[in-house]
Amino acid sequence: MKTPRLPIAIQQAVMRRLRENLAQANLKLDRHYPEPKLVYTQRGTSAGTAWLESYEIRLNPVLLLENIDTFIAEVVPHELTHLLVWKHFGRKAPHGKEWKWMMESVLGVPARRTHQFALQSVRRNTFPYHCQCQQHQLTVRRHNRVVRGEAVYRCVHCGEPLVAG
């Protein structure tokens, strides 16, 4: 899938949110953390990722276009918080108590670990598997692990191993 071009107004709204959250954090923490690099290269089902060493936030342009308001309100501060925690506390658990505190107490945003966006447009091919009670769809990665004998996946309901087909 080709990466969509983001309208400049959306990019500006993302940058505005990033700068507002960063200014708020700098004020509350009495620090002067720099503005991270922001790129729109995240692919797959992740809404975004924070790259600590390069001090960079990568956002998924497809999910952003499909969920503009919620994405800007939740994903941008979520990823910024990872960078702020790293700068403020050093390397910590990705969604640990420091991250939760930074999200809720410093930025005033609910600390959610995962997004709830529809993923049909970004999901890759899946492979049908079944157990005794239902049909399942495994990702390419999981399917390949089964084929190579590296993994056996089980149904969370009946506990039976999943079988291709």
From Swiss-Prot:
Q: Which Pfam families match?
A: SprT-like, Zn_ribbon_SprT
Q: Which GO terms describe its cellular component?
A: cytoplasm
Record bears the keyword Acetylation: no
Domain SprT-like spans what residues?
22-163
Question: Which residues participate in Zn(2+) binding?
Answer: H78, H82
Q: Does the keyword Cytoplasm apply?
A: yes
The UniProt entry's GO biological process terms, in alphabetical order, are: response to stress
Quote the record's cofactor note: Binds 1 zinc ion.
Q: PANTHER family under this entry?
A: PROTEIN SPRT
Q: Which family does it belong to?
A: Belongs to the SprT family.
Designated name of the protein? Protein SprT
Give the organism the record lists.
Answer: Salmonella paratyphi A (strain AKU_12601)
Q: What is the lineage of its organism?
A: Bacteria, Pseudomonadati, Pseudomonadota, Gammaproteobacteria, Enterobacterales
